[in-house]
């Protein structure tokens, strides 16, 4: 019984400390872009939205202040990328919607289309 109580208390403290690390707030990048969303250690980490000075908007996941995971980037001219990100770059599976209604659906590597799609 003591072992069970110990495990319950330990799990409580672990979940409490983890949830305390993530908070909702705002962050301004060096280039002036404004982020609103989950923060960890004063940096974007988790889900959030960034509005860039150009008018571009990114909504999706961040890890240690960089776009990483699933996200959507809407360019100010109406073009859009929906897909995976790694280290602030389009990387992995994704779809790019062009202004002329064409689209590329396929793999991306370091911001470049990989293959024919």
Question: Positions of the model-derived regions?
Answer:
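Conserved anchor residues at repeat-unit boundaries in beta-strand-based tandem repeats, strongest
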Residues: 34-44, 57-68, 80-91, 103-115
């Amino acid at each position: 019984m003591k072992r069970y109580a110990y495990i319950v208390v330990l799990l409580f403290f672990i979940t409490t400390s983890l949830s305390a690390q993530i908070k909702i707030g705002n962050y301004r990048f060096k280039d002036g872009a404004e982020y609103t969303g989950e923060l960890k250690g004063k940096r974007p980490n988790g889900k959030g939205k960034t509005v860039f000075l150009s008018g571009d908007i990114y909504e999706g996941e961040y890890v240690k202040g960089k776009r990483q995971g699933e996200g959507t980037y809407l360019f100010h001219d109406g073009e859009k990328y929906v897909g995976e990100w790694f280290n602030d770059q389009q990387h992995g599976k994704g779809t790019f919607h062009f202004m002329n209604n064409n689209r590329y659906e396929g793999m991306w590597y370091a911001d470049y289309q990989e293959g024919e799609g």
